């Protein structure tokens, strides 16, 4: 059986991701988070407050191979929120992600389509939308989707335009 090389798979993945509406698609090696020690210290100090789930299996959060054994690559995608228009004068402002439908379900459906494509190539994968035990900002930065700002949010430049965006 002839299998395509990784660049063919990556090109196919990114082309399909654009068709699904993702604005960015990047791939990097699956490596342990450079901020692992900071996370462990943060947890030891009890700074996770009532988020007890953060303290369960912190190693899984910092190493993709702990989440998916044999993992070799991390795929990071960006998706621009729809902006239905400017808010009326005198009204309070609401974050863009809160204007429309809950993005978790929308993006999970799109990820399912991408996972189907990767399965054709024999890949095993896990997809998360702000819900998995992964340090997504570290992976997105390693993939080249953007850089970490002072706020800790990832600032990225859209593939479609040279405008900086903030995501968290």
Where are these regions (language model features)?
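Auxiliary alpha/beta "docking" domains used to position bulky ligands
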Residues: 1-159, 166
């Amino acid at each position: 059986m002839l299998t395509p090389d990784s660049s063919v798979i990556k090109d196919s993945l990114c082309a399909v991701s654009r068709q699904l509406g993702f604005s960015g698609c990047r791939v990097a090696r699956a490596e342990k988070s450079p901020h692992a020690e900071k996370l462990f210290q943060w947890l030891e100090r009890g700074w996770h407050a009532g988020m007890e789930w953060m303290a369960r299996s912190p190693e899984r959060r910092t190493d993709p191979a702990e989440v998916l054994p044999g993992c070799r690559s991390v795929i990071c995608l960006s998706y621009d929120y729809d902006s239905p228009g400017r808010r009326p004068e005198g009204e309070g402002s609401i974050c863009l992600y809160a204007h429309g439908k809950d993005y978790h379900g929308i993006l999970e459906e799109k990820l399912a389509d991408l996972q189907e494509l990767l399965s054709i190539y024999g890949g095993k994968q896990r997809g998360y939308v702000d819900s998995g035990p992964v340090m997504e900002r570290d992976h997105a930065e390693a993939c080249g989707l953007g850089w970490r700002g002072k706020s800790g949010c990832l600032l990225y430049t859209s593939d479609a335009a040279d405008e900086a965006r903030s995501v968290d």
